Design a protein with these regions (language model features):
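Charged, amphipathic alpha-helical regulatory modules used
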Residues: 1-108
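Conserved catalytic cores of very large enzyme subunits
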Residues: 90-94, 100-525
Length: 525
């Protein structure tokens, strides 16, 4: 008579025949069975068989379950046996999940990052901090759950064995990877972060701050990097607004010093609004749009030609200097913010990239020059800023050759990159980029993601082959070195195995696409 049983964890417990009978009956019920007596009979025969084989030796749980399967099959209960085997497998899998997860939790809780691979797997997260550890708790639990409950067994097995690597498995059912954020469109009428609405910015410092907020906010909706495809064009709008404001302020200052006009600020505001309403003109960095002539005509009613020339020269000089300084400070703030502001549970900074290089306007050039100078200067103690990753676009006729309008910026980019690793360079004239480029359409200029991939082709609709507002679903890598090693020089086998894994990954990514395609808009505020 069996008195004790050895549990999987080594504990010794009293043997209970009813537990075996109940498990068999549940399996029978799952396939339509209703005979509890049959379940009891199988349990008794199992015990008798064990005693016959092993005598008084105490059984393990696994040994009893093996004999239950054998007895069910021999007694002609094939369907119940199949259900019992499935039930046993699911229980085993649940135990494995719990066991693996507990080991991971133990490592995260008690080991430091220097001793834990799990805590170090993302260089952008400090695994020793409270929020870093908390993030890893959630990430580790999600990975275990998805591997055991969501992924198809063949996909999970290939990932677990290292034949493929499903990137960001912890976000499998939650969100997409990365996005090219179109700041021009975003800033036109303001935008919401999900927690409040932000008005359209009206100064380069506001443009810089809201760019960081947009990147940070979107980072909380995605698991990959965030990129701005048109940083120079987008920030140029902020420089334009800043110059206009500073120019009019300096005209008012000069009027106050050199004339007897009362309320000079109100006077300047009034005639500037009239000029804009009548002609659409505003002060601009290039001073080539006719605004100064229109302004001189308005001022001539109160001032002499010499006074007007002096005031305008003073305003231009100081407005340029102040705007340039404000732009440098805005770019400096952007770099410092993107290396210090937190996202994702407060555990990491946004993985950010900015693309620039093609804007030849004075405003765009001022942005590019100052973001590179701020990068070259480094962070507070001179450290090299890791973010944003910067990509400088190079093109003949724009920046590649001496005499090109942005050639000086190209040289500055090379100098900055030599010291600070960034910017990287993308070549618009490269054949695989040039075929998409349409002059006069900045949206067709190649841009790279926060994750350093490029998305511009569009098989579904070739008329929409653009960069802004595009993104990636996700990635899965294939372990090519392993295939090569296993091939042992057999090229044919290598390509057969590669094709098999390509098809496997294709199916896995389509499954992930189907999952994410069912998400609701409200889940991405």
């Amino acid at each position: 008579m069996i008195s004790y049983i050895i549990k999987r964890d080594g504990r010794r417990e009293s043997f209970d025949l009813d537990k075996i009978a109940n498990a068999v009956f549940r399996a029978a019920q799952s396939v339509g069975g209703t005979d509890a007596a049959m379940a009891r009979d199988v349990a008794e025969k199992t015990c008798a068989l064990y005693e016959q084989l092993h005598g008084s030796q105490e059984p393990t749980v696994e040994e009893i379950q093996d004999l239950v399967e054998k007895e069910l099959i021999e007694c002609g209960h094939a369907q119940t046996a199949k259900a019992y085997i499935l039930y046993r497998y699911e229980r085993t899998r649940d135990r494995e999940v719990k066991s693996n997860l507990m080991k991971i939790m133990n490592e995260l809780t008690f080991d430091s990052a220097k001793d834990s691979d799990i805590k170090r797997e993302n260089a952008n997260i400090d695994g020793d901090t409270a929020m870093g550890t908390m993030l890893k708790y959630g990430s580790s639990a999600a990975k275990e759950f998805y591997e055991m409950r969501v992924l198809k067994p063949e996909h999970a097995k290939a990932h677990r064995n290292g034949d493929i690597h499903i990137h960001d498995l912890d976000f499998l059912t939650l969100t997409t990877t990365c996005c090219q954020i179109d700041l021009i469109q975003l800033f036109q009428h303001g935008f919401s972060t999900g927690h409040g609405f932000l008005r359209e910015p009206n100064d380069i410092s506001s443009y810089s701050a809201l760019a960081c907020i947009a990147i940070q906010s979107n980072q909380n909706d995605q698991h990959g990097g965030q990129s701005v495809p048109n940083f120079d064009y987008a920030m140029a709008g902020g420089v334009k607004k800043t110059y206009r404001k500073r120019y009019l302020q300096n005209v008012a200052r000069a009027l106050e010093l050199l004339t007897d006009i009362e309320e000079p600020q109100a006077f300047v505001k009034s005639y500037a609004a009239a000029i804009q309403q009548e002609t659409g003109l505003i002060p601009c960095l290039a001073n080539n749009n006719g605004y100064q002539e229109a302004e001189a005509q308005k001022l001539s009613e109160r001032l002499t030609a010499d006074q007007i020339a002096t005031i305008q020269a003073f305003a231009k000089k100081n407005a340029y200097r102040e705007t340039n300084r404000a732009t440098y400070q805005a770019m400096e703030a952007l770099i410092h913010n993107l290396n210090t502001m937190n996202s994702r549970a407060g555990a990491q900074v946004p993985f950010s990239s900015i693309n620039y290089g093609m804007d030849t306007s004075p405003e765009g050039r001022m942005v590019m020059r100052n973001v590179m100078l701020a990068t070259e200067a480094g962070l507070g103690n001179g450290e090299t800023p890791i973010f944003p990753i910067q990509i400088f676009r190079v093109k003949e006729g724009v920046s590649f050759n001496p005499g090109d309008p942005n050639y000086d910026l190209y040289r500055l980019a090379i100098r900055t990159s030599a010291k600070r690793l960034f910017p990287n360079f993308s070549f618009v004239d490269a054949p695989f980029n040039k075929k998409y480029y349409k002059e006069g359409h900045p949206e067709t200029e190649i841009a790279y993601m926060g994750c350093r991939t490029r998305v511009i082709g569009n098989v579904y609709d070739p008329t929409r082959e653009v960069c802004p507002r595009r993104g990636n679903l996700s990635f899965t890598s294939i372990n090519l070195p392993r295939i090569a090693i296993k091939a042992k020089g057999d090229i044919g086998w290598f390509f057969e195995e590669l094709e098999r894994l390509c098809n496997l990954v294709h199916d896995q990514l389509l499954e992930r696409l189907e999952i994410i395609s069912n998400k609701k808009v409200y889940k991405f505020p």
